[in-house]
């Protein structure tokens, strides 16, 4: 782990401007509304979380995989590579980078197949269509896009430090930690430094637990306007999330999602899976 966030590739290359992010997303917003795109973000974060839990990965590995996923689609359209392929690829790469140990090929494919069938069958009625050669090829494109900038900083460590400094670990840490986990269903990890996200999550936890921490926050040397921006995104997430019926809505949204086109000369090779067995756009 690099020692200084401000000198890291995470800060120098992967804290993005919101307007640039929205500009890159316009290709997908021709097919999806902003709300539908946001629901896709939640859904595929849930897929990565479920896959990581099935493989018994640490939460930091799952969080890193989620950041990789978001970084790729911050630069490319959803139709460039099928997100159903990208999700396990990100988990595979993150498990190596975070020194969890390489997840075996058999376990990864078995986990993806099982998770889609048991947890997300309402959205994916067919079998997981990819094999390890697809994941290794997808990993190459992911590494190329990220320019091998693989170290990701997360809000968990600064959150621990802040809660300990505040002296309310038992009261605040479990809730603030869950809120940090939820932020990965938004764009926050692409837009703000992790310590700011940690402070915003702690602030929300203080409000929920009715802990008066105004003095503690007032003494911080931090741009509170940015913290409030993050808090607004978190509150918006919870407001929209409670009205999101994933089981009813996702099949329709996935059908609208732009998809990779099959290579023109491989129609006969793809069998029943069509373009999904390729997973890559040729356009």
Swiss-Prot record:
<protein>
    <recommendedName>
        <fullName>Cyclin-C</fullName>
    </recommendedName>
</protein>
<keyword id="KW-0805">Transcription regulation</keyword>
<feature type="domain" description="Cyclin N-terminal">
    <location>
        <begin position="46"/>
        <end position="144"/>
    </location>
</feature>
<keyword id="KW-0804">Transcription</keyword>
<keyword id="KW-0010">Activator</keyword>
<dbReference type="InterPro" id="IPR043198">
    <property type="entry name" value="Cyclin/Ssn8"/>
</dbReference>
<dbReference type="GO" id="GO:0005634">
    <property type="term" value="C:nucleus"/>
</dbReference>
<dbReference type="InterPro" id="IPR031658">
    <property type="entry name" value="Cyclin_C_2"/>
</dbReference>
<comment type="similarity">
    <text>Belongs to the cyclin family. Cyclin C subfamily.</text>
</comment>
<comment type="subunit">
    <text>Component of the Mediator complex. The cylin/CDK pair formed by ccnc/cdk8 also associates with the large subunit of RNA polymerase II.</text>
</comment>
<dbReference type="InterPro" id="IPR013763">
    <property type="entry name" value="Cyclin-like_dom"/>
</dbReference>
<dbReference type="GO" id="GO:0016538">
    <property type="term" value="F:cyclin-dependent protein serine/threonine kinase regulator activity"/>
</dbReference>
<dbReference type="InterPro" id="IPR006671">
    <property type="entry name" value="Cyclin_N"/>
</dbReference>
<dbReference type="Pfam" id="PF16899">
    <property type="entry name" value="Cyclin_C_2"/>
</dbReference>
<comment type="function">
    <text>Component of the Mediator complex, a coactivator involved in regulated gene transcription of nearly all RNA polymerase II-dependent genes. Mediator functions as a bridge to convey information from gene-specific regulatory proteins to the basal RNA polymerase II transcription machinery. Mediator is recruited to promoters by direct interactions with regulatory proteins and serves as a scaffold for the assembly of a functional preinitiation complex with RNA polymerase II and the general transcription factors.</text>
</comment>
<keyword id="KW-0195">Cyclin</keyword>
<feature type="compositionally biased region" description="Polar residues">
    <location>
        <begin position="267"/>
        <end position="283"/>
    </location>
</feature>
<dbReference type="GO" id="GO:0006357">
    <property type="term" value="P:regulation of transcription by RNA polymerase II"/>
</dbReference>
<dbReference type="Pfam" id="PF00134">
    <property type="entry name" value="Cyclin_N"/>
</dbReference>
<keyword id="KW-0678">Repressor</keyword>
<feature type="region of interest" description="Disordered">
    <location>
        <begin position="252"/>
        <end position="283"/>
    </location>
</feature>
<dbReference type="InterPro" id="IPR036915">
    <property type="entry name" value="Cyclin-like_sf"/>
</dbReference>
<keyword id="KW-0539">Nucleus</keyword>
